């Protein structure tokens, strides 16, 4: 029997090896043939694109080369970078007259070149994966209307940005995303945001105090020059920290400051251009990322354990006198409360706290920065918006206006149009990106499984065909009758918070927060662009000013140091500049 087994094994081994070799060759052949097969599927639908410049890297080498060439062409000269002349700046571009350059052609030069060569929709390659660049409004509409869980966020983004987002709602897919969205989305409904306006006004007090002290240091009547980015980020930090962590907001700030540092590290290299395997090597940068990731998790879990202990104590104290205070009902409390039914409850809490930071902070801070830049460059709109704020809040320049509440902010129509135009010219997200997890029919287009769909948000927002000849000018009046009347194909031409079912959860919070901050600032200050302001939008996960925003700030006409917006007091934080 043993000899038969030995004989059978010896006879079967070559067959097994041959079958394994044949199977391996078939798999390899299919892998090698897939790009050509996919390209042919798109070619039959009239879609072509640049040929891959590398067998393994696709079009990435050409993309890198064009970015390097654009950066070299934009390097500072002896005369310095472009400066702004509108609204009090010095010697450079007049934004009121000339409008804004299409910064996308500088940041993403390869897309601009390929669009001119191959049309509205074309195919390119990210390593071995097909990517479809889409500016056809009809196809964008189909992508937006798709509610299938077979389309979602690309897996390369999940892996490449895992330290920032983990498996939270912003990057999750399928049933996991649907389950998390059901828990997180209600926290950003307008009914919840309505109750946060006083919180926003309170969070603005350190900013007001900081700018007031700088004006006083400049002599009171003169303008103080301020790099405002740090103050605006500090304001947004306070808002989301108070909303997410309640009375623990000071500890929440420590978490979010580390997230900001982590975000800066992650944005140093584009997730598209980075080599995936390198993120596992113990380089200096990776060790800093791992350290910050661990610290953030530890800080969040420390709060979670305290909240869970408080909830347990409250339950066990039922019926006795003087029960302990119930656990707080803030974002963190809600996430903890709903974490029990999740497969990995601790990861659910940690990842979604990080996701709330990006949904509720980054968008607001950067949008507020661009909004103040645009108002500084267009003083007539600044005056109109200020007049509306004073009319709604009851101030007359000499008397202190009331602090805005939700109803007041909702009535500020001009301020709302200014914010919408800001989001059009400088949308926080540069792209809406999706991946098909099976072959999908999107209108007339068949997208094979594994296709990336790239919708360039900024390009659509600046499209002359949709917005008319003033597309690159700042003109909030275009939104006088709403988005639908402002442009052609509104679903495809205006999507500052994303597209379809995956629209940013924090959009209500961001819009109300920016409007509230603008109202508080306009009621107190007048501002112009500094001659030192260098206009250079840069891509760092989101589009933000590369060199910061320098403003010259003075008190609004007729006010003195004692005439302030009537708000509740808040602790003064030191400036971040």
UniProtKB/Swiss-Prot annotation:
Q: What class of enzyme is it?
A: oxidoreductase
Which BP terms does GO give this entry? gibberellin catabolic process
Where is this chain's protein located in or outside the cell?
Answer: Endoplasmic reticulum membrane
| Example of a GO MF term | oxidoreductase activity, acting on paired donors, with incorporation or reduction of molecular oxygen
Annotated protein name in UniProt: Cytochrome P450 714D1
Q: Which residues lie on this side of the membrane: Lumenal?
A: 1-3
InterPro entries noted in UniProt:
Cyt_P450, Cyt_P450_CS, Cyt_P450_E_grp-I, Cyt_P450_sf, Cytochrome_P450_Monooxygen
Q: What is its EC number?
A: 1.14.-.-
To which species is this protein native? Oryza sativa subsp. japonica
Bilayer disposition of the protein? Single-pass type III membrane protein
Q: Name one Pfam family in it.
A: p450
Please give the function described in this protein's UniProt entry: Catalyzes the 16alpha,17-epoxidation on non-13-hydroxylated gibberellins (GAs), including GA4, GA9, and GA12. No activity with GA1, GA20, GA53 or ent-kaurenoic acid. Reduces the biological activity of GAs.
The text of the family note is:
Belongs to the cytochrome P450 family.
Question: What domain of life?
Answer: Eukaryota
Q: Does the keyword Oxidoreductase apply?
A: yes
């Amino acid at each position: 029997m043993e000899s038969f087994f030995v004989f059978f094994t010896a006879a079967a081994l070559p067959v097994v090896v041959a079958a394994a070799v044949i199977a391996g060759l078939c798999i390899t052949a299919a892998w090698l043939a897939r790009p050509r097969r996919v390209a042919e599927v798109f070619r039959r639908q009239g879609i072509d694109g640049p040929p891959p410049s590398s067998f393994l890297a696709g079009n990435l080498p050409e993309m890198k080369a064009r970015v390097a060439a654009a950066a070299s062409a934009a390097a500072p000269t002896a005369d310095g970078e472009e400066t702004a002349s509108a609204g009090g700046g010095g010697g450079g571009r007049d934004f009121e007259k000339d409008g804004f350059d299409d910064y996308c052609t500088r940041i993403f030069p390869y897309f601009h070149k390929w669009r001119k060569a191959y049309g509205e929709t074309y195919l390119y390659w990210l390593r071995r994966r097909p990517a479809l660049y889409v500016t056809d409004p009809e196809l964008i509409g189909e992508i937006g209307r798709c509610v299938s869980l077979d389309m979602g966020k690309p897996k390369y983004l999940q892996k490449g940005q895992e330290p920032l987002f983990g498996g939270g709602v912003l990057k999750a897919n399928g049933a996991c995303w649907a389950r998390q969205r059901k828990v997180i989305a209600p926290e950003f409904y307008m009914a919840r945001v309505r109750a946060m306006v006083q919180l926003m006004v309170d969070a603005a007090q350190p900013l007001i105090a900081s700018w007031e002290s700088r004006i006083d240091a400049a002599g009171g009547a003169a303008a103080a020059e301020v790099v405002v980015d740090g103050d605006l980020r500090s304001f947004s930090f306070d808002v989301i920290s108070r909303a997410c962590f309640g009375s623990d907001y000071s500890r929440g700030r420590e978490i979010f400051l580390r997230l900001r540092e982590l975000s800066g590290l992650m944005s140093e290299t584009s997730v598209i251009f980075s080599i995936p395997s390198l993120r596992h090597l113990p380089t200096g940068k990776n060790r800093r990322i791992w350290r910050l990731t661990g610290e953030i998790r530890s800080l969040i879990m420390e709060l979670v354990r305290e909240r869970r202990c408080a909830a347990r104590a409250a339950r066990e104290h039922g019926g006795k006198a003087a029960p302990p205070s119930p656990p707080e009902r803030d974002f963190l409390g809600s996430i903890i409360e709903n974490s029990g039914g999740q497969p990995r409850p601790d990861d659910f809490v940690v990842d979604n706290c990080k996701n709330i930071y990006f949904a509720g902070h980054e968008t607001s801070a950067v949008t507020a920065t661009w909004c103040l830049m645009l108002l500084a460059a267009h003083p007539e709109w600044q005056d109109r918006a200020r007049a509306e704020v004073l009319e709604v809040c009851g101030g007359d320049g000499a008397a202190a206006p009331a602090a805005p509440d939700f109803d007041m902010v909702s009535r500020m129509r001009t301020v709302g149009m200014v914010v919408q135009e800001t989001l059009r010219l400088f949308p926080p997200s540069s792209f809406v990106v999706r991946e098909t997890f099976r072959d999908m029919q999107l209108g007339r287009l068949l997208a094979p499984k594994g296709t990336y769909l790239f919708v360039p948000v900024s390009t659509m927002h600046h499209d002359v065909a949709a917005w008319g000849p003033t597309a690159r000018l700042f003109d909030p009046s275009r939104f006088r009758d709403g988005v639908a009347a402002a442009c052609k194909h509104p679903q495809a031409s205006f999507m500052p918070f994303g597209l379809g079912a995956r629209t940013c959860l924090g959009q209500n919070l961001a819009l109300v927060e920016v409007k509230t901050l603008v109202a508080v600032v306009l009621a107190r200050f007048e501002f112009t662009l500094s001659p030192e302001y260098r206009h250079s939008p840069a891509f760092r996960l989101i589009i933000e000013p590369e060199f910061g925003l320098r403003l010259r700030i003075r008190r609004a006409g007729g006010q003195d140091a004692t005439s302030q917006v009537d708000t509740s007091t808040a602790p003064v934080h030191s400036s971040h500049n």
